[in-house]
Protein backbone atom coordinates (compact mmCIF):
# COMPACT_ATOMS: atom_id res chain seq x y z
CA UNK A 1 0.00 0.00 0.00
CA UNK A 2 1.26 3.43 -0.87
CA UNK A 3 -0.21 6.87 -1.11
CA UNK A 4 -2.96 5.66 -3.42
CA UNK A 5 -6.45 4.24 -3.34
CA UNK A 6 -6.81 1.69 -0.58
CA UNK A 7 -7.96 -1.87 -1.32
CA UNK A 8 -10.58 -3.91 0.49
CA UNK A 9 -10.87 -4.23 4.26
CA UNK A 10 -10.08 -0.57 4.83
CA UNK A 11 -11.65 2.24 6.80
CA UNK A 12 -14.49 3.90 4.90
CA UNK A 13 -13.05 7.30 5.79
CA UNK A 14 -9.45 6.59 4.77
CA UNK A 15 -8.44 7.14 1.13
CA UNK A 16 -4.64 7.26 1.33
CA UNK A 17 -1.85 7.10 3.87
CA UNK A 18 1.91 7.42 3.59
CA UNK A 19 5.02 8.19 5.60
CA UNK A 20 7.13 11.19 4.64
CA UNK A 21 10.70 10.77 3.42
CA UNK A 22 12.38 10.52 6.85
CA UNK A 23 9.51 8.57 8.45
CA UNK A 24 8.84 11.28 11.03
CA UNK A 25 5.29 12.10 9.87
CA UNK A 26 2.27 10.42 8.31
CA UNK A 27 0.20 12.07 5.58
CA UNK A 28 -3.44 10.94 5.57
CA UNK A 29 -6.12 11.55 2.94
CA UNK A 30 -9.75 11.02 3.91
CA UNK A 31 -13.24 11.69 2.55
CA UNK A 32 -13.28 14.90 4.57
CA UNK A 33 -9.84 16.24 3.64
CA UNK A 34 -6.28 15.56 4.72
CA UNK A 35 -4.11 15.66 7.81
CA UNK A 36 -0.49 15.44 8.92
CA UNK A 37 0.31 13.36 12.00
CA UNK A 38 3.61 13.30 13.87
CA UNK A 39 4.99 9.84 14.69
CA UNK A 40 6.98 10.55 17.86
CA UNK A 41 5.40 11.89 19.94
CA UNK A 42 2.22 10.77 18.22
CA UNK A 43 -0.18 13.61 17.49
CA UNK A 44 -1.98 15.42 14.73
CA UNK A 45 -0.04 18.44 13.46
CA UNK A 46 -2.31 19.77 10.74
CA UNK A 47 -5.85 19.22 9.45
CA UNK A 48 -7.69 20.64 6.47
CA UNK A 49 -11.28 19.69 5.66
CA UNK A 50 -10.84 20.39 1.96
CA UNK A 51 -13.02 17.54 0.74
CA UNK A 52 -12.14 14.03 -0.46
CA UNK A 53 -8.37 13.75 -0.95
CA UNK A 54 -6.98 10.67 -2.68
CA UNK A 55 -3.25 11.50 -2.54
CA UNK A 56 -1.18 13.41 0.03
CA UNK A 57 2.60 13.63 -0.26
CA UNK A 58 4.84 15.63 2.07
CA UNK A 59 8.27 17.14 1.43
CA UNK A 60 10.10 15.89 4.53
CA UNK A 61 8.80 17.99 7.48
CA UNK A 62 8.30 21.21 5.55
CA UNK A 63 4.98 22.94 5.01
CA UNK A 64 4.99 21.94 1.33
CA UNK A 65 2.36 19.29 0.51
CA UNK A 66 1.24 17.81 -2.82
CA UNK A 67 -2.49 17.00 -3.03
CA UNK A 68 -4.79 15.20 -5.44
CA UNK A 69 -8.54 15.24 -4.89
CA UNK A 70 -11.05 12.57 -5.83
CA UNK A 71 -13.85 13.14 -8.33
CA UNK A 72 -16.56 15.39 -6.96
CA UNK A 73 -20.22 15.09 -7.93
CA UNK A 74 -20.67 18.84 -7.50
CA UNK A 75 -20.37 20.36 -11.02
CA UNK A 76 -19.15 23.64 -9.49
CA UNK A 77 -16.34 21.91 -7.66
CA UNK A 78 -12.75 22.31 -8.83
CA UNK A 79 -11.84 18.83 -7.60
CA UNK A 80 -10.45 16.41 -10.17
CA UNK A 81 -8.19 13.34 -10.01
CA UNK A 82 -6.27 14.96 -12.90
CA UNK A 83 -5.42 18.09 -10.91
CA UNK A 84 -2.34 18.36 -8.68
CA UNK A 85 -2.12 21.12 -6.09
CA UNK A 86 1.10 22.18 -4.37
CA UNK A 87 0.06 23.74 -1.07
CA UNK A 88 1.85 25.66 1.68
CA UNK A 89 0.08 24.48 4.82
CA UNK A 90 1.60 27.14 7.04
CA UNK A 91 0.46 30.03 4.86
CA UNK A 92 -2.78 28.30 3.86
CA UNK A 93 -2.04 29.04 0.21
CA UNK A 94 -1.93 27.15 -3.10
CA UNK A 95 1.50 27.58 -4.68
CA UNK A 96 0.54 26.11 -8.03
CA UNK A 97 -1.87 23.79 -9.80
CA UNK A 98 -1.07 21.34 -12.58
CA UNK A 99 -3.62 19.60 -14.80
CA UNK A 100 -2.77 16.28 -16.44
CA UNK A 101 -4.39 14.37 -19.33
CA UNK A 102 -5.38 11.38 -17.18
CA UNK A 103 -5.86 10.60 -13.50
CA UNK A 104 -2.86 11.07 -11.21
CA UNK A 105 -1.96 7.74 -9.60
CA UNK A 106 1.16 8.68 -7.66
CA UNK A 107 3.22 11.68 -6.55
CA UNK A 108 6.82 11.62 -5.27
CA UNK A 109 8.92 14.49 -3.92
CA UNK A 110 12.45 15.25 -2.87
CA UNK A 111 14.20 18.59 -2.46
CA UNK A 112 15.06 18.83 -6.16
CA UNK A 113 12.38 16.99 -8.09
CA UNK A 114 8.63 16.45 -8.25
CA UNK A 115 7.54 13.23 -9.97
CA UNK A 116 3.93 12.71 -11.08
CA UNK A 117 2.89 9.20 -12.11
CA UNK A 118 0.03 8.56 -14.53
CA UNK A 119 -0.95 5.12 -15.77
CA UNK A 120 1.32 5.32 -18.84
CA UNK A 121 3.41 8.44 -18.25
CA UNK A 122 5.76 9.93 -15.68
CA UNK A 123 6.24 13.71 -15.50
CA UNK A 124 9.39 15.16 -13.94
CA UNK A 125 9.50 18.75 -12.61
CA UNK A 126 12.13 21.01 -11.10
CA UNK A 127 10.66 21.62 -7.67
CA UNK A 128 12.33 25.03 -7.32
CA UNK A 129 10.34 26.59 -10.16
CA UNK A 130 7.85 23.85 -11.13
CA UNK A 131 9.26 23.71 -14.66
CA UNK A 132 8.54 20.53 -16.61
CA UNK A 133 11.89 18.89 -17.35
CA UNK A 134 11.04 15.53 -18.86
CA UNK A 135 8.21 13.15 -19.72
CA UNK A 136 8.68 9.37 -19.69
CA UNK A 137 6.37 6.97 -21.48
CA UNK A 138 5.84 3.72 -19.57
CA UNK A 139 3.96 0.48 -19.90
CA UNK A 140 0.57 0.48 -18.11
CA UNK A 141 1.31 1.02 -14.42
CA UNK A 142 -2.09 1.22 -12.67
CA UNK A 143 -0.53 0.76 -9.22
CA UNK A 144 1.93 3.64 -9.80
CA UNK A 145 4.86 1.40 -8.84
CA UNK A 146 8.00 3.51 -8.60
CA UNK A 147 10.53 4.78 -6.06
CA UNK A 148 12.19 8.18 -5.76
CA UNK A 149 15.40 8.65 -3.83
CA UNK A 150 15.06 11.18 -0.98
CA UNK A 151 18.65 12.21 -1.71
CA UNK A 152 19.35 15.42 -3.62
CA UNK A 153 22.76 14.16 -4.76
CA UNK A 154 21.92 10.58 -5.80
CA UNK A 155 18.64 11.67 -7.30
CA UNK A 156 17.34 8.47 -8.92
CA UNK A 157 13.92 7.24 -9.98
CA UNK A 158 13.24 3.49 -10.23
CA UNK A 159 10.24 2.09 -12.08
CA UNK A 160 9.28 -1.10 -13.97
CA UNK A 161 11.02 -1.32 -17.32
CA UNK A 162 8.67 -0.81 -20.28
CA UNK A 163 10.07 -3.82 -22.18
CA UNK A 164 12.08 -6.90 -21.40
CA UNK A 165 15.81 -6.40 -21.57
CA UNK A 166 17.17 -8.11 -24.72
CA UNK A 167 20.04 -9.70 -22.79
CA UNK A 168 17.91 -10.99 -19.92
CA UNK A 169 18.80 -14.59 -18.99
CA UNK A 170 15.08 -15.15 -18.38
CA UNK A 171 13.99 -14.12 -21.89
CA UNK A 172 13.80 -16.24 -25.03
CA UNK A 173 16.31 -14.96 -27.58
CA UNK A 174 14.12 -16.27 -30.38
CA UNK A 175 10.97 -14.52 -29.22
CA UNK A 176 9.15 -12.12 -31.48
CA UNK A 177 9.29 -8.36 -31.00
CA UNK A 178 5.83 -8.41 -29.45
CA UNK A 179 6.91 -10.99 -26.92
CA UNK A 180 10.03 -8.95 -26.20
CA UNK A 181 7.83 -5.96 -25.40
CA UNK A 182 5.80 -7.73 -22.74
CA UNK A 183 6.01 -6.40 -19.18
CA UNK A 184 6.47 -9.71 -17.37
CA UNK A 185 10.26 -9.54 -17.35
CA UNK A 186 10.55 -8.09 -13.85
CA UNK A 187 13.14 -5.56 -15.01
CA UNK A 188 13.61 -2.23 -13.23
CA UNK A 189 14.78 0.92 -14.97
CA UNK A 190 17.03 3.38 -13.10
CA UNK A 191 16.61 6.98 -14.28
CA UNK A 192 18.92 9.81 -13.21
CA UNK A 193 16.70 12.81 -12.48
CA UNK A 194 19.60 15.28 -12.63
CA UNK A 195 21.04 14.29 -16.02
CA UNK A 196 17.59 13.15 -17.22
CA UNK A 197 18.99 9.91 -18.60
CA UNK A 198 18.74 6.18 -18.02
CA UNK A 199 21.71 4.84 -16.07
CA UNK A 200 20.90 1.13 -15.87
CA UNK A 201 18.31 -1.61 -16.27
CA UNK A 202 18.24 -4.19 -13.49
CA UNK A 203 16.92 -7.66 -14.23
CA UNK A 204 15.49 -8.09 -10.77
CA UNK A 205 12.82 -10.81 -11.07
CA UNK A 206 11.23 -13.24 -13.51
CA UNK A 207 7.70 -11.92 -12.87
CA UNK A 208 6.29 -8.36 -12.80
CA UNK A 209 7.49 -5.90 -10.17
CA UNK A 210 5.10 -5.26 -7.27
CA UNK A 211 7.14 -2.97 -5.00
CA UNK A 212 10.27 -0.82 -5.07
CA UNK A 213 12.14 1.22 -2.46
CA UNK A 214 15.27 3.37 -2.51
CA UNK A 215 17.23 4.09 0.65
CA UNK A 216 17.82 7.56 2.11
CA UNK A 217 21.11 8.09 0.28
CA UNK A 218 19.94 6.76 -3.09
CA UNK A 219 22.56 3.99 -3.13
CA UNK A 220 20.39 0.91 -2.52
CA UNK A 221 17.26 -0.40 -4.25
CA UNK A 222 14.94 -3.06 -2.80
CA UNK A 223 12.69 -4.96 -5.20
CA UNK A 224 9.82 -7.45 -4.97
CA UNK A 225 7.83 -9.24 -7.66
CA UNK A 226 4.16 -10.16 -7.69
CA UNK A 227 5.08 -13.58 -6.27
CA UNK A 228 6.37 -11.85 -3.17
CA UNK A 229 8.53 -14.73 -1.96
CA UNK A 230 11.95 -13.17 -2.57
CA UNK A 231 13.17 -9.64 -1.85
CA UNK A 232 16.36 -8.44 -3.54
CA UNK A 233 18.63 -5.48 -2.80
CA UNK A 234 20.85 -3.90 -5.46
CA UNK A 235 23.45 -1.17 -5.43
CA UNK A 236 22.59 2.00 -7.34
CA UNK A 237 23.52 2.92 -10.00
CA UNK A 238 25.93 0.01 -10.55
CA UNK A 239 23.16 -2.63 -10.23
CA UNK A 240 25.26 -5.07 -8.22
CA UNK A 241 23.10 -7.55 -6.31
CA UNK A 242 24.01 -7.29 -2.64
CA UNK A 243 21.29 -9.26 -0.83
CA UNK A 244 18.55 -11.78 -1.47
CA UNK A 245 15.97 -12.42 1.25
CA UNK A 246 13.29 -15.08 1.62
CA UNK A 247 10.00 -13.59 2.81
CA UNK A 248 8.16 -16.90 2.75
CA UNK A 249 7.44 -20.04 0.76
CA UNK A 250 3.94 -19.03 -0.37
CA UNK A 251 3.10 -16.17 -2.69
CA UNK A 252 1.97 -12.90 -1.14
CA UNK A 253 1.29 -9.40 -2.36
CA UNK A 254 3.99 -7.02 -1.13
CA UNK A 255 2.53 -3.70 -0.04
CA UNK A 256 5.54 -1.85 1.29
CA UNK A 257 9.35 -1.92 1.43
CA UNK A 258 11.37 0.52 3.52
CA UNK A 259 14.99 0.86 4.64
CA UNK A 260 15.95 2.40 7.95
CA UNK A 261 17.89 5.68 7.94
CA UNK A 262 21.33 4.02 7.99
CA UNK A 263 20.42 1.18 5.59
CA UNK A 264 21.13 -1.67 8.00
CA UNK A 265 17.52 -2.94 8.10
CA UNK A 266 14.80 -3.48 5.51
CA UNK A 267 11.14 -3.83 6.54
CA UNK A 268 8.59 -5.60 4.32
CA UNK A 269 4.80 -5.71 4.69
CA UNK A 270 2.42 -7.86 2.67
CA UNK A 271 -1.16 -9.13 2.59
CA UNK A 272 -0.30 -11.55 5.39
CA UNK A 273 -0.35 -10.42 9.02
CA UNK A 274 3.44 -10.78 9.30
CA UNK A 275 5.83 -7.88 8.77
CA UNK A 276 9.40 -9.05 8.14
CA UNK A 277 12.57 -7.14 9.03
CA UNK A 278 15.73 -8.21 7.23
CA UNK A 279 19.26 -7.34 8.30
CA UNK A 280 21.70 -5.95 5.76
CA UNK A 281 25.41 -6.51 6.23
CA UNK A 282 27.34 -3.53 7.57
CA UNK A 283 29.34 -3.20 4.37
CA UNK A 284 26.34 -2.94 2.07
CA UNK A 285 26.04 0.81 2.22
CA UNK A 286 29.69 1.39 1.44
CA UNK A 287 29.73 -1.20 -1.30
CA UNK A 288 26.71 0.39 -2.91
CA UNK A 289 28.65 3.55 -3.63
CA UNK A 290 31.16 1.88 -5.95
CA UNK A 291 30.80 0.54 -9.44
CA UNK A 292 29.94 -3.11 -9.91
CA UNK A 293 32.85 -5.53 -9.85
CA UNK A 294 33.34 -8.86 -11.58
CA UNK A 295 32.78 -10.98 -8.49
CA UNK A 296 30.14 -13.66 -8.15
CA UNK A 297 27.70 -11.32 -6.42
CA UNK A 298 27.19 -9.08 -9.41
CA UNK A 299 23.63 -8.90 -10.64
CA UNK A 300 22.68 -9.78 -14.20
CA UNK A 301 22.37 -6.16 -15.29
CA UNK A 302 22.84 -5.20 -18.92
CA UNK A 303 26.44 -4.24 -18.29
CA UNK A 304 27.36 -7.64 -16.91
CA UNK A 305 26.46 -9.22 -20.24
CA UNK A 306 27.51 -6.77 -22.91
CA UNK A 307 30.93 -5.95 -21.51
CA UNK A 308 30.24 -2.25 -20.96
CA UNK A 309 32.18 -0.83 -18.04
CA UNK A 310 30.28 2.43 -17.68
CA UNK A 311 26.55 2.32 -17.01
CA UNK A 312 26.06 6.09 -16.96
CA UNK A 313 24.44 7.91 -19.85
CA UNK A 314 26.02 11.24 -20.80
CA UNK A 315 24.59 14.09 -18.73
CA UNK A 316 22.43 16.73 -20.32
CA UNK A 317 19.06 18.40 -19.91
CA UNK A 318 16.40 17.52 -22.43
CA UNK A 319 12.64 17.49 -22.62
CA UNK A 320 12.60 14.90 -25.39
CA UNK A 321 11.17 11.66 -24.03
CA UNK A 322 13.25 9.53 -26.40
CA UNK A 323 16.62 11.21 -26.22
CA UNK A 324 18.43 10.10 -23.09
CA UNK A 325 15.54 7.78 -22.24
CA UNK A 326 14.91 4.05 -22.36
CA UNK A 327 14.98 3.81 -26.16
CA UNK A 328 18.34 5.56 -26.38
CA UNK A 329 19.75 3.41 -23.60
CA UNK A 330 18.53 0.17 -25.17
CA UNK A 331 19.66 1.25 -28.63
CA UNK A 332 23.17 1.82 -27.35
CA UNK A 333 23.28 -1.57 -25.65
CA UNK A 334 21.75 -3.41 -28.61
CA UNK A 335 24.49 -1.96 -30.80
CA UNK A 336 27.10 -2.93 -28.25
CA UNK A 337 25.60 -6.38 -28.03
CA UNK A 338 25.62 -6.80 -31.81
CA UNK A 339 29.19 -5.60 -32.18
CA UNK A 340 30.45 -7.03 -28.93
CA UNK A 341 29.04 -10.18 -27.37
CA UNK A 342 27.49 -11.65 -30.53
CA UNK A 343 30.72 -11.36 -32.46
CA UNK A 344 32.65 -12.64 -29.50
CA UNK A 345 30.41 -15.69 -29.20
CA UNK A 346 30.74 -16.46 -32.90
CA UNK A 347 34.52 -16.26 -32.68
CA UNK A 348 34.64 -18.33 -29.54
CA UNK A 349 32.30 -20.98 -30.98
CA UNK A 350 34.97 -21.68 -33.57
CA UNK A 351 37.31 -22.50 -30.70
CA UNK A 352 35.03 -25.28 -29.39
CA UNK A 353 33.10 -22.91 -27.11
CA UNK A 354 35.77 -22.70 -24.47
CA UNK A 355 35.09 -19.03 -23.75
CA UNK A 356 31.33 -19.55 -23.69
CA UNK A 357 31.65 -22.37 -21.21
CA UNK A 358 33.72 -20.17 -18.94
CA UNK A 359 31.29 -17.24 -19.00
CA UNK A 360 28.15 -19.34 -18.58
CA UNK A 361 29.79 -21.51 -15.95
CA UNK A 362 30.61 -18.40 -13.95
CA UNK A 363 26.98 -17.28 -14.01
CA UNK A 364 24.97 -20.43 -13.38
CA UNK A 365 26.42 -21.51 -10.01
CA UNK A 366 25.67 -18.07 -8.58
CA UNK A 367 22.04 -18.31 -9.76
CA UNK A 368 21.63 -21.79 -8.30
CA UNK A 369 23.20 -20.73 -5.01
CA UNK A 370 20.76 -17.82 -4.78
CA UNK A 371 17.85 -20.24 -5.20
CA UNK A 372 19.08 -22.46 -2.39
CA UNK A 373 20.43 -19.97 0.14
CA UNK A 374 18.31 -16.81 0.51
CA UNK A 375 18.56 -15.17 3.92
CA UNK A 376 15.62 -15.36 6.32
CA UNK A 377 14.27 -12.48 8.37
CA UNK A 378 16.17 -11.07 11.33
CA UNK A 379 13.01 -9.95 13.13
CA UNK A 380 9.26 -9.99 12.57
CA UNK A 381 5.96 -8.79 13.99
CA UNK A 382 2.36 -9.92 13.79
CA UNK A 383 -0.39 -7.43 13.03
CA UNK A 384 -3.76 -7.88 14.79
CA UNK A 385 -5.61 -8.24 11.47
CA UNK A 386 -4.90 -10.31 8.37
CA UNK A 387 -5.73 -9.21 4.85
CA UNK A 388 -5.33 -5.48 5.46
CA UNK A 389 -2.95 -3.43 3.36
CA UNK A 390 -0.20 -1.61 5.20
CA UNK A 391 2.74 0.76 4.97
CA UNK A 392 5.81 0.01 7.09
CA UNK A 393 8.69 2.27 8.14
CA UNK A 394 11.58 2.16 10.59
CA UNK A 395 11.99 5.02 13.03
CA UNK A 396 15.14 7.11 12.64
CA UNK A 397 15.19 8.09 16.33
CA UNK A 398 14.18 4.93 18.22
CA UNK A 399 14.51 1.14 17.61
CA UNK A 400 10.87 0.91 16.54
CA UNK A 401 9.02 -0.51 13.55
CA UNK A 402 6.03 1.63 12.56
CA UNK A 403 3.07 0.24 10.62
CA UNK A 404 0.00 2.04 9.30
CA UNK A 405 -2.90 -0.10 8.06
CA UNK A 406 -5.81 0.56 5.73
CA UNK A 407 -8.09 0.21 8.74
CA UNK A 408 -6.69 3.51 9.95
CA UNK A 409 -4.43 2.30 12.77
CA UNK A 410 -0.86 3.22 13.60
CA UNK A 411 1.23 0.58 15.37
CA UNK A 412 4.68 0.99 16.90
CA UNK A 413 6.70 -2.14 17.74
CA UNK A 414 10.00 -2.34 19.60
CA UNK A 415 12.73 -4.30 17.83
CA UNK A 416 15.68 -5.97 19.55
CA UNK A 417 18.57 -4.74 17.41
CA UNK A 418 20.96 -7.30 18.88
CA UNK A 419 18.97 -10.53 18.88
CA UNK A 420 16.03 -9.85 16.58
CA UNK A 421 13.07 -12.20 16.96
CA UNK A 422 9.47 -11.12 17.46
CA UNK A 423 8.92 -7.40 17.94
CA UNK A 424 6.84 -6.15 20.87
CA UNK A 425 3.80 -3.91 20.37
CA UNK A 426 4.38 -0.68 22.29
CA UNK A 427 1.76 1.74 20.98
CA UNK A 428 -1.41 1.74 18.94
CA UNK A 429 -3.40 4.78 17.83
CA UNK A 430 -6.19 5.60 15.44
CA UNK A 431 -5.31 7.94 12.59
CA UNK A 432 -8.97 8.77 12.11
CA UNK A 433 -9.27 9.84 15.74
CA UNK A 434 -5.76 10.58 17.09
CA UNK A 435 -7.09 10.94 20.65
CA UNK A 436 -8.01 7.25 20.69
CA UNK A 437 -5.41 5.07 22.45
CA UNK A 438 -6.37 1.40 22.42
CA UNK A 439 -3.32 -0.01 24.22
CA UNK A 440 -2.29 0.06 27.84
CA UNK A 441 0.85 2.00 26.96
CA UNK A 442 0.58 5.56 28.22
CA UNK A 443 0.67 8.13 25.48
CA UNK A 444 3.21 10.93 25.74
CA UNK A 445 1.33 14.02 26.82
CA UNK A 446 3.54 16.53 25.07
CA UNK A 447 2.82 19.19 22.53
CA UNK A 448 3.11 18.09 18.93
CA UNK A 449 5.52 20.00 16.75
CA UNK A 450 4.36 22.26 13.95
CA UNK A 451 5.43 21.98 10.34
CA UNK A 452 8.41 24.10 9.45
CA UNK A 453 8.71 26.24 6.35
From Swiss-Prot:
Motif extent (L/FRRG motif): 245-249
Membrane topology: Peripheral membrane protein
Region (Disordered) location: 284-324
Keywords: Autophagy, Endosome, Membrane, Protein transport, Repeat, Transport, Vacuole, WD repeat
Record's compositionally biased regions (Low complexity): 289-320
Subcellular location: Preautophagosomal structure membrane; Vacuole membrane; Endosome membrane
Molecular function (Gene Ontology), one example: protein-macromolecule adaptor activity
WD repeat segments: 9-49, 204-244, 249-288
A GO CC term attached to the entry: fungal-type vacuole membrane
Pfam families named among the record's database cross-references: PROPPIN
InterPro entries for the chain: PROPPIN, WD40/YVTN_repeat-like_dom_sf, WD40_repeat_dom_sf, WD40_rpt
Family: Belongs to the WD repeat PROPPIN family.
This protein's domain notes: The N-terminus might form a beta-propeller domain involved in specific binding to phosphatidylinositol 3,5-bisphosphate (PIP2), leading to the association of the protein to the membrane.
Subunit architecture: Component of the PI(3,5)P2 regulatory complex.
PANTHER family: WD-REPEAT PROTEIN INTERACTING WITH PHOSPHOINOSIDES WIPI -RELATED
Free-text function comment from the UniProt entry: The PI(3,5)P2 regulatory complex regulates both the synthesis and turnover of phosphatidylinositol 3,5-bisphosphate (PtdIns(3,5)P2). Necessary for proper vacuole morphology. Plays an important role in osmotically-induced vacuole fragmentation. Required for cytoplasm to vacuole transport (Cvt) vesicle formation, pexophagy and starvation-induced autophagy. Involved in correct ATG9 trafficking to the pre-autophagosomal structure. Might also be involved in premeiotic DNA replication.
Protein name: Autophagy-related protein 18
Organism expressing this protein natively: Mycosarcoma maydis
Gene giving rise to this polypeptide: ATG18
Amino acid sequence: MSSSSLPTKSSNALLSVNFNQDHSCIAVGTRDGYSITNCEPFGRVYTNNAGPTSLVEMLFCTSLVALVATSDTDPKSNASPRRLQIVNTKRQSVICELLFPTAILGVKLNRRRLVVVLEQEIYIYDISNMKLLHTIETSPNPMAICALSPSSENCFLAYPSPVASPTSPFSNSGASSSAEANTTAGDVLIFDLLSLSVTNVIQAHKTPISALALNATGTLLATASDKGTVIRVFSIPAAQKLHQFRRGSYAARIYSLNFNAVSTLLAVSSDTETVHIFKLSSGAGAGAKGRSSSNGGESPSLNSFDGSSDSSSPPGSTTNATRGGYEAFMGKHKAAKSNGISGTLRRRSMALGRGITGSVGGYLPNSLTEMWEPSRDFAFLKLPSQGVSSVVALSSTTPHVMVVTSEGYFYSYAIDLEHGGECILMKQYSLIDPDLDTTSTARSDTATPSLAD
